[in-house]
Amino acid sequence: MSEAYKNAGVDIEAGYEAVKRMKKHVERTKRLGVMGSLGGFGGMFDLSELSYQKPVLISGTDGVGTKLKLAFSMDKHDTIGVDAVAMCVNDVLAQGAEPLFFLDYLAVGKADPVKIEQIVQGVAEGCEQSGSALVGGETAEMPGLYTADEYDIAGFSVGVAEKDEIVTGEKIEEGHLLIGLSSSGLHSNGFSLVRKVLLDDAELDLDTTYEPFERPLGEELLEPTRIYVKPVLAAVKSGKIDGMAHVTGGGFIENIPRMLPEGLSAEIDHGSWPIPPIFSFLQEYGKLKEEDMFNVFNMGIGFVLAVKEEHLTDVIGTLESHGEKAYLIGRVKKGEGVTFGGAALS
């Protein structure tokens, strides 16, 4: 290898070792349609092997944000990859797409093969959960841009849907009901506020277990984002889903209206689902207003589906038969934005 490059902070051999370690994780994500193997200049996928008549590709890209800072502090890297996949596949899912393949971009300050393997292991886990093939990626060593212990990760998902089965929200009307799917906690949004409230201001310790939790705070915060692909796709195939929203940055306030036609609003029945204790914990320590909480966090609901009233029972039954926790959380009305129990939050 080039000693000059190594002296500049780039260890090519460590990069090769990282690729060698990740191959077994990539291998377990293979699915119908994948062509070639890891290491080519581009990942290949043969769409003709699938039974779509008028396929439309739907793509999405996202990252994990400052949740990474907690992974650095905890030296725990095996779940961040799940987050990267979840943030992307849940987005393409919101239009009714079946995720096909995924690529990751990992930028590191120093190539640590063990740490990189842990990250990619999480990516592979997320791909398995979503039925995606991990067909490629990039690991870039960037000394001087990141410290030796830092990294950033982003993901890219491509999915497919039949052209006449894409879920656009256009069919949503006044009277549609809203089904909420439970989140696992914070997912991957709002962590700049989380860190300010709990670590900077309250000076809490990530390794300490606080009431009402049964594990250290850091582990509670690093709980990976839920992936909704398999249960939601089962419901989508019924043709009874008219709109979907992935509740990410901006919480209820920003994300639910994204699926609604102009002139319609969402009325949410506050209290119709259990809110995980991490949210009240945050609200108490940060003295945060309720509107701030719903404008930043998912508040226990990570995905929302809009259905006609006559389809409610069937759709919830399908979701629950796939192990999903589904709640009737509200309805669509005339107006704009989101209201809670008839009171607008600003």
Curated annotation (Swiss-Prot):
Pathway(s) it belongs to: Purine metabolism; IMP biosynthesis via de novo pathway; 5-amino-1-(5-phospho-D-ribosyl)imidazole from N(2)-formyl-N(1)-(5-phospho-D-ribosyl)glycinamide: step 2/2
GO molecular function list: ATP binding; phosphoribosylamine-glycine ligase activity; phosphoribosylformylglycinamidine cyclo-ligase activity
Catalytic activity: 2-formamido-N(1)-(5-O-phospho-beta-D-ribosyl)acetamidine + ATP = 5-amino-1-(5-phospho-beta-D-ribosyl)imidazole + ADP + phosphate + H(+)
GO cellular component annotations of the record: cytosol
Primary localisation category: cytoplasm
Uppermost EC category: ligase
Annotated InterPro entries: PurM-like_C_dom (IPR010918), PurM-like_C_sf (IPR036676), PurM-like_N (IPR016188), PurM-like_N_sf (IPR036921), PurM_cligase (IPR004733)
The keyword Nucleotidyltransferase is annotated on this UniProt entry: no
Listed EC numbers: 6.3.3.1
GO terms for biological process, alphabetical: 'de novo' IMP biosynthetic process; adenine biosynthetic process; purine nucleotide biosynthetic process
TM stretches of this protein: none
Keywords, sorted A to Z: ATP-binding, Cytoplasm, Ligase, Nucleotide-binding, Purine biosynthesis
Cellular compartments annotated: Cytoplasm
NCBIfam families named in the record: purM
Family membership noted in the UniProt record: Belongs to the AIR synthase family.
Name the UniProt record assigns to this protein: Phosphoribosylformylglycinamidine cyclo-ligase
Organism: Bacillus subtilis (strain 168)
Taxonomic path: Bacteria, Bacillati, Bacillota, Bacilli, Bacillales
Name of the gene encoding the protein in the UniProt record: purM
